[in-house]
Amino acid sequence: MGIPLPKPVMTQLQERYGNAIFRCGSNCVNGYRETMEDAHLTYLTDSWGFFGVFDGHVNDQCSQYLERAWRSAIEKESIPMTDERMKELALRIDQEWMDSGREGGSTGTFFVALKEGNKVHLQVGNVGDSRVVACIDGVCVPLTEDHKPNNEGERQRIENCAGRVENNRVDGSLAVSRAFGDREYKLGSGSQLEQKVIALADVQHKDFTFDSNDFVLLCCDGVFEGNFPNEEVVAYVKQQLETCNDLAEVAGRVCEEAIERGSRDNISCMIVQFKDGSDYAAEPHTTVVPGPFSAPRNSGFRKAYESMADKGNTTVGALLERRYDTLKAAEALTPEETEELSQFENGPEAKLTGAERQKWFSNYFQKLCEAASNGPSDQMERLQSLQQQAGIPLSILLSLMGEQTQ
C-alpha cells in the first residue's frame, strides 16, 4: 500500500442509473491512497440488472478489465443463469486475464437481480473481500463472506499448493485468498482451482419485495476497513435515506464516514433499490464533486487529485474552479476551508470568464507542479501521517523503517 497521502483526496465520482424497476446510485473516493484502483458496473434491462464492484490491487488494470469483461459477458447471457454458469464465467474471465500476461489483481462482488411478479430475486457472486450487504425489513443481512487466507478451507488449499499463511496473508503478502489476476499466486502445476489464490465465486440467493424500503449495498473492503461494521453501515444508510432521496449522495456520505472512522483505502459504495428509478434514467449518469484541495504542495496528493479529475472525464482546472467557487460562495468557512481558500491567493481576475477563467486554475495547478522539488517535504508529511496512524513516536518509526531496509 505504501505510505499514505498526508490528506485524503475526497473528490467524488457520483453515478446514477435507473429504469422502471431499479434505482441505483454509486460513489467512490480516492482517500489516502496514491491511486484509485476501484471500478464498478451497472447494467440494466427491462426485467433484470447486473451490479458489480471490483477492488483492484497493485494497479487499476485488472479492476478496469473486470468492468469491461463482465459487461461483455452479461450482454450475451440468458437470464436467469445457473450457479454453475456464474462460476464458469468468473473462472473464464480470470483465465482470459491470465492469458493476457498483464500484472495486477482485483476482488469482485456482483449480483444479478431478476424481477418476477412482486419479487426481485438476487443471485450473488463473490470473489475476495468486497461485500454485498442487504437491508431487509430494516434488518442487516450479509449476502457474502470474505475470502481470507486464515479461513480454514482457504488455508488448507493454500498450504496444499506449497503456500503459507503468514500474518493472515498469502505468503505473507496478499490479504485475500480468492481474487481475479494475481498471477504470481497461480503458477502451480495444478488446475485453475488448485492454486494458492483462485477466482471461484461463492454464490448465494435472496428474495426481495419490489417497491419496498429494502436496499442492497455493494462495497469494497475500504468501507469496512476502519471501525464501520456491516450493521453500522446499514444503519447509517437507513438514517441518511430518511432525509435524502439521492442514492449517489448517500453513497458519498458512506465514503466520507468510512474515512472519518479510520479507513485509509480507496472507497466505493453502490446502493440499489428495487423500485421505479425513472428519475435517474433522465439525468446525466456521472457527476464529479470536487473535494478539498488540502495538500497542494504535496506531489502525491496533486497527482491523485488530477487522476480523479481524469476518471471523471474532466480537467483539474475545471475541478479547482468549481472548488474555489464553492468556497467563495459559502456563508461560513471552517478553519481548514479558510486555509484552503487562502492558497488560491487572490484568485482569478474578475474580468476572466469561461475558458480563460478555467485556464487560470489550470495554470495555478501547473505552477505548483513546476515549483522547486520538495520531495523530502512530501516524504516527511506522509511519514507524519503514518506515524499518527501507528500511534508511536516518529523517531521510533524511522528507526524501525531503517532496520527493515538493512
From Swiss-Prot:
InterPro entries per UniProt: PP2C, PP2C_BS, PPM-type-like_dom_sf, PPM-type_phosphatase-like_dom
Cofactor(s), names only, from the UniProt record: Mg(2+); Mn(2+)
Hydrolase recorded as keyword: yes
Top EC class of this enzyme: hydrolase
Organism superkingdom: Eukaryota
Pfam family, any one: PP2C
Domain PPM-type phosphatase: 23-274
Catalytic activity: O-phospho-L-seryl-[protein] + H2O = L-seryl-[protein] + phosphate; O-phospho-L-threonyl-[protein] + H2O = L-threonyl-[protein] + phosphate
Cofactor annotation comment: Binds 2 magnesium or manganese ions per subunit.
Matches recorded under CDD domains: PP2Cc
Molecular-function GO term, any one: protein serine/threonine phosphatase activity
Signal peptide from the UniProt entry: none
EC number assigned by the record: 3.1.3.16
Entry binding sites for Mn(2+) 1: 55-56
Function: Enzyme with a broad specificity.
Recorded family membership: Belongs to the PP2C family.
Subunit structure: Monomer.
Name used for this protein in its record: Protein phosphatase 2C
Native species: Leishmania chagasi
